Amino acid sequence: MFIKNLPHKTVERLSQYRRALLLILSKEKTHVFSHEIAQMLHITPVQVRRDLMLIGYSGNLRKGYDIKELIDLIGKIIDSERGQRVAVVGLGNLGKAFISYFKGKRSKLSMIAAFDVNPEKINRVFDGVPCYHINQLPEIIKQNNISIGIITVPSEQAPEIAEALVLSGIKGILNYTPKPLNVPAYVYLEEYDMITSLEKVAFFAKKNDERFK
């Protein structure tokens, strides 16, 4: 199921809604109201309702949203029908954390391969994911129809890795280095700069500290 022109931020929140709904479902609830979802995610009920209206879903005034029904609908919208395969480049602590996170998840995303240059990691299996030498990247990406790449290498290596991923047929890249990347328009790029995020948190923590003294 594909909805044209769905805002990027809405897609992000839909993923968050699904995680929240799964948590609520685990508590044996069948229905939930927008204000309950909003409270869990620290957003407004209006935002929740607006996002769900964009995907054509409305709840019952008395009972709220059917949790299982909404989880299924979100899955049809943000997941690929056939599933998508992921590779991580750079098997340091962050790369290993990604592999560990994917282990046992019931997601349509599956971690297929890891790449590194460290001889102690190459040809080993980490939580079910084989690690290959970076020189094997084009071959492994194409062989396994991998469409998403996660970059967790030192920042100076990121542009070269991104280029190799693009040339190998990758359609989406998650960049976890502080180095901004340039990729073709047909490749979706999401960049997460942990230093910037940490400095942002530090700024607002300081602001709140001064405010509530």
Where are these regions (language model features)?
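Extreme N-terminal segment that seeds HTH/winged-HTH DNA-binding domains in transcriptional regulators
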Residues: 1-30
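Phosphate-bearing ligand-interacting subdomains
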Residues: 17, 22-25, 129-213
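HTH-adjacent hinge/linker in prokaryotic transcriptional regulators
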Residues: 31, 35, 40-85
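Glycine-rich Rossmann-fold phosphate-binding loop(s) that bind the pyrophosphate
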Residues: 91-92
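N-terminal Rossmann-fold NAD(P) dinucleotide-binding loop
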Residues: 95
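NAD(P)-binding Rossmann-fold cofactor-contacting core
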Residues: 106-127
